[in-house]
Design a protein with these regions (language model features):
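Beta-rich, blade/repeat-based domains predominating
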Residues: 56-68, 99-111, 150-167, 196-218, ...
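Short, conserved, GDST-rich strand-edge loop motifs in beta-rich repeat architectures
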Residues: 58-70, 122-134, 220-237, 311-332
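Blade-loop segments of beta-propeller domains
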Residues: 92-159
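Beta-propeller blade signature
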Residues: 236-246, 326-343
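Blade-level signature of beta-propeller repeat domains, shared across WD40, Kelch, NHL, RCC1
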Residues: 345-403
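Conserved beta-strand positions in repeat-built beta-propeller and related beta-rich domains
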Residues: 75-78, 114-119, 162, 168-175, ...
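Loop/turn-rich, solvent-exposed surfaces of beta-rich toroidal or solenoidal domains
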Residues: 257-283, 287-339
Length: 408
């Protein structure tokens, strides 16, 4: 754990994540936890789903790891209709649920949180001044407030990311394109695969994943090279592709349900969901190498230092997924978030959902946030929370406090 204390100190002092850690210390201090089932910790849940009781467990190293790295996670599950904040709370992980309609793509950083659903984009901003006012006092260090909504129509929003100009790019799966938004239109198509003959709401290739490089869209994944309605379903087990956006060229074929391409540490990473694996891509040879195989359908990933935080889903629809390699390898799949060391492929720890959540879509690390809050649209705190420009604050006069201590 000393390596992680150094990492936290380094991040605090320099703002950068160190690329070196003591691999021996890391695996030695955490690996034993994975082998002893009696040492799993039940997670603490708040605002849990009402229809099905939530139960989850985690390896007992994760709360300490989250605290030392000063991170939390935001996770989306469209199946349960929830966005989950995963936070260290003493010796346990707290999974804090908020309700949305089929939330999928997430674009998040220290100042903003943007969530995509089937037909809606929800915009949130972090307002740190609100955090101390949330009970229990002194516990929260960030608070995301809802700011606005954009209605896209049913475009089956998948992954999203902001570019260098703070423009949001969206994987529009139903129309098989990358799009952006403006105030006048449902969406603005910006790019589509060259093998598609038309812009049509037929989910022709199941475009799903987006990797940004240098702050611009660079790589996308799709489940097929097909130009017919839902044509990708005919060869879903190994018809997946990776494309270069700039060149509009297919770089890889033969992938098994690829998702979540990411450019990290000068490498292109990809989740081959049908294999339940994490892989790296060699663009020169147009090949890929498996780094880790995991006990579930891999989808949703983010990185921090030498760690990958990977979403796993159970995939229960055997009629749809019956020919996947993952199902041949495992009779039962797992849902949760797995933490993998990207240099060794070893599992460092995990959060496993045992009821209530069966599918994960997006996983993002919230760096520098230990215990964030996400206010729902009907929260009464929104009525008395005002975010003003700095130049306007000097002219604000607050009313006197009442006898009870509240503002009049």
């Amino acid at each position: 754990l000393q390596a992680w204390r150094f990492a936290c100190h380094w991040v605090k002092q320099t703002g950068h994540v160190p690329e070196i850690t003591s691999r021996e210390q890391l695996t030695r201090s955490h690996k034993a936890t994975l082998m002893d089932k009696n040492r799993y910790m039940p997670a603490e849940h708040s605002s849990a789903p009402a229809k099905e009781p939530l139960h989850s467990v985690h390896t007992n190293n994760l709360p300490t790891l989250f605290e030392q790295l000063r991170i939390s996670l935001v996770v989306s599950t469209y199946q349960a209709g929830k966005v989950i904040l995963v936070r260290a709370d003493g010796h346990v992980l707290n999974t804090h649920f908020r309700s949305f309609t089929r939330p999928m793509g997430i674009a998040a950083d220290h100042t903003r949180l943007t969530i995509g659903g089937t037909n809606t984009i929800w915009y949130y901003r972090n307002v740190p001044a609100v955090a101390p006012k949330i009970e229990p006092a002194g516990k929260h260090d960030a608070c995301y407030l809802p700011r606005r909504i954009h209605v896209t129509g049913d475009i089956d929003i998948h992954e999203m990311a902001y570019d260098n100009d703070d423009e949001l790019w969206i994987v529009n799966t139903r129309f098989a394109c990358l799009c952006t938004l403006d105030g006048d239109h449902s969406f603005y198509p910006r790019w589509r695969p060259k093998f598609l003959s038309a812009l049509s709401p037929e989910d022709r290739c199941h475009l799903n994943g987006l990797a940004m490089v240098g702050g611009k869209p660079k790589y996308v994944t799709a489940l097929g090279e097909t130009d017919a309605q839902a044509g990708w379903r005919a060869n879903k087990a190994n018809g997946g592709i990776l494309m270069d956006v700039d060149r509009n060229q297919i770089m890889l074929r033969g992938l098994s349900m690829p998702h979540s391409p990411r450019w990290y540490q000068n490498k292109l990473w990809i989740l081959e969901s049908g294999q339940g694996s994490l892989a790296t891509v060699d663009l020169e040879t147009q090949t890929w190498r498996t780094v880790a195989q995991l006990p579930g359908f891999t989808r949703g990933i983010d990185f921090y230092g030498p760690l990958a935080f990977i979403g796993l889903s159970q995939v229960r629809e055997k009629a749809i997924f019956s020919d996947f390699p993952l199902l041949e390898r495992l009779d039962e799949r797992t849902c949760g978030v797995w933490v993998v060391h990207i240099e060794t492929g070893e599992t460092i720890g995990f959060l496993r959902f045992e009821s209530g959540v069966q599918e994960i879509f997006a996983v993002q690390v919230l760096a520098g946030m230990r215990f964030p809050e996400l206010l729902e649209w009907q929260d009464e705190k929104l009525s008395l929370s005002y975010v003003l420009p700095d130049e306007a604050l000097k002219d604000v006069a607050l009313p006197p406090r009442s006898a009870s201590g509240n503002q009049a």
